[in-house]
Regions:
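Bacterial N-terminal signal peptides that target proteins for export
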Residues: 1-10
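Bacterial Sec-dependent signal peptides at the C-terminal "C-region" and cleavage site
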Residues: 11-13, 17-27
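Low-complexity, acidic/polar, glycine-enriched regions of mature
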Residues: 22-205
Length: 205
């Protein structure tokens, strides 16, 4: 359920990373403090799940990806982000179990986002949209994620954004609890705040 949106967000966030792809090494790492979380609703209260781990593979031939991105200049590059379904944490054991079941975690252990292209949006801030596909619960569909780029400490790149995800589009049935008396809403908002730096690609935790 919520997992689905999360993965999207995880996707969205990673796409952003593409703009921050590293220099000649062609790799980029996520700094500690990077966050990815999902907000949803139910018939009784709002809820939130966080992503404890993101595995990103970023490649670019450009040696000044961060600088060019902050100037609104496009660079060539590819991005693939994998998110282990098992790392989703909703701070509620029952919710975690229902999420895993809704996302078919046993059969499809990973949520994957692959970026195919992106574009900048003219304006006072450097923003844009990442276009790619999201593979979730065994189904792959196109997705577009709006993002904003900013400077981070020590020459890094900060990428923020959020995107609503309709779980049923990926054939994810919103969970129900307490014999159907508690129902989770079908739309989840994926939020991300990523701190990126040039260097060896690693898993952000």
């Amino acid at each position: 359920m919520m997992r689905s949106p999360l993965s999207h967000l995880a996707v969205a966030a990673t796409l952003v990373c593409i703009a921050a792809t590293p220099m000649e090494s062609g790799s980029l790492s996520l700094r500690d403090g990077s966050r990815l979380w999902f907000d949803g609703t139910s018939t009784i209260r709002a809820w939130r799940c966080t992503a404890d781990k993101i595995d990103a593979t970023l490649h670019s031939p450009d040696s000044a990806v961060i600088a060019n991105t902050l100037e609104g200049k496009k660079v060539a590059g590819t991005v693939q982000v994998d998110f282990p379904v098992a790392t989703l944490e909703c701070k509620n054991g029952t919710m975690n179990e229902h999420m895993a079941k809704a996302l078919k975690a046993t059969a499809f252990t990973t949520i994957r986002f692959t970026m195919h292209s992106y574009e900048f949006t003219k304006g006072s801030a450097v923003s844009g949209t990442l276009h790619g596909t999201l593979q979730l619960s065994g189904k792959t569909l196109p997705i577009s994620v709006p993002v904003t780029f900013g400077a981070a400490a020590d020459g890094g790149l900060r990428v923020t954004g959020k995107v609503p995800v309709q779980m049923t589009d990926w054939d994810v049935k919103p969970p129900t609890l307490m014999m159907g008396t508690i129902r989770v809403g079908p739309v989840v908002t994926v939020n991300f705040d990523l701190q990126l730096q040039q260097g060896r690609a690693v898993a952000a935790q």
